Amino acid sequence: MSQQRTARRQPSLLVDPAQETVRRRCRDPINVENLLPSKIRINLEENVQYVSMRKALKVKRPRFDVSLVYLTRKFMDLVRSAPGGILDLNKVATKLGVRKRRVYDITNVLDGIELVEKKSKNHIRWIGSDLNNFGAAPQQKKLQAELSDLSAMEDALDELIKDCAQQLLELTDDKENERLAYVTYQDIHGIQAFHEQIVIAVKAPEETRLDVPAPREDSITVHIRSTKGPIDVYLCEVEQNHSNGKTNDGIGASPSKSSHPQCPEKEDEPPQ
């Protein structure tokens, strides 16, 4: 009998307690019927919860969350929002979730460079520059002001362009103005920019296409194409102001023998 007990295998230290309990109960023929699946499941679930709880206790905060740089940034945020720059160090330690010793590490450095002063044992006051304008150099402020002025000017120009476009649309769509949509030779002659220039007036229907290729040294080519009617082209010779009748290029300018187009009658279609 003693030999049978000695030959019995001792449970290993690495065996799960829940599994060993099940194994021992299974060896006893009397308790096999009383062993229910629910009991096995309960034991396993309790074991898993125990292991998960142990792992949760071992979780540590990230190193960056407790670093001095991170705490200093949070401390400066509290200084920026504090009335009068006065802080209670006990409340600071509570908000930062660290020991008061870590807060003293920050305040001692700031006190050494004369950015804070101690009001009492647990209170300090910020005496440095205004944190709301921290980092805003004068040049940056100047550029921001110029940018604001340019933005306002751009908005004003956009409104003017929009207003001019609306007025032009109303002018061209008005039936009363359609019969007066023409210019005379005297109108062209009165424009100073057209003096000593060759002016060509084109009267064409809607959707006429005009292409001007890159000009050459001695000539300019213009292509006009229309699919809705004929195209009328007028050469408007602007008179020269020189008494000798010569242009700036030294070429003689003879007066035009053709009659200049005058103001058309109402029934005629005016040139565009």
Curated annotation (Swiss-Prot):
| Positions occupied by motif DEF box | 95-129
Q: Please give the residue ranges the record annotates as the region Disordered.
A: 242-272
DNA-binding residues per UniProt? 50-129
Q: Does the keyword Manganese apply?
A: no
Record's keyword terms, sorted = Cell cycle, DNA-binding, Nucleus, Repressor, Transcription, Transcription regulation
The segment annotated Dimerization runs over 130-222
Segments for region (Binding to corepressors):
1-62
What ranges does the record give for the region Transcription repression, renumbered to this chain?
A: 173-272
Gene Ontology cellular component terms for the protein in this record: DNA replication factor A complex; MLL1 complex; nucleus; RNA polymerase II transcription regulator complex
Start and end residues of each stretch annotated as Leucine-zipper: 143-164
Return one GO MF term: sequence-specific DNA binding
**What are the BP-aspect GO terms?**
regulation of transcription by RNA polymerase II
Q: Where in the cell is it found?
A: Nucleus
- Which InterPro entries does the annotation name? E2F, E2F-DP_heterodim, E2F_CC-MB, E2F_WHTH_DNA-bd_dom, WH-like_DNA-bd_sf, WH_DNA-bd_sf
> What family name appears in the similarity comment?
Belongs to the E2F/DP family.
Its function? Inhibitor of E2F-dependent transcription. Binds DNA cooperatively with DP proteins through the E2 recognition site, 5'-TTTC[CG]CGC-3'. Has a preference for the 5'-TTTCCCGC-3' E2F recognition site. E2F6 lacks the transcriptional activation and pocket protein binding domains. Appears to regulate a subset of E2F-dependent genes whose products are required for entry into the cell cycle but not for normal cell cycle progression. Represses expression of some meiosis-specific genes, including SLC25A31/ANT4.
Q: How does it assemble?
A: Forms heterodimers with DP family members TFDP1 or TFDP2. Component of the DRTF1/E2F transcription factor complex. Part of the E2F6.com-1 complex in G0 phase composed of E2F6, MGA, MAX, TFDP1, CBX3, BAT8, EUHMTASE1, RING1, RNF2, MBLR, L3MBTL2 and YAF2. Component of some MLL1/MLL complex, at least composed of the core components KMT2A/MLL1, ASH2L, HCFC1/HCF1, WDR5 and RBBP5, as well as the facultative components BACC1, CHD8, E2F6, HSP70, INO80C, KANSL1, LAS1L, MAX, MCRS1, MGA, KAT8/MOF, PELP1, PHF20, PRP31, RING2, RUVB1/TIP49A, RUVB2/TIP49B, SENP3, TAF1, TAF4, TAF6, TAF7, TAF9 and TEX10.
Q: What is this protein called?
A: Transcription factor E2F6
Q: Which gene encodes it?
A: E2f6
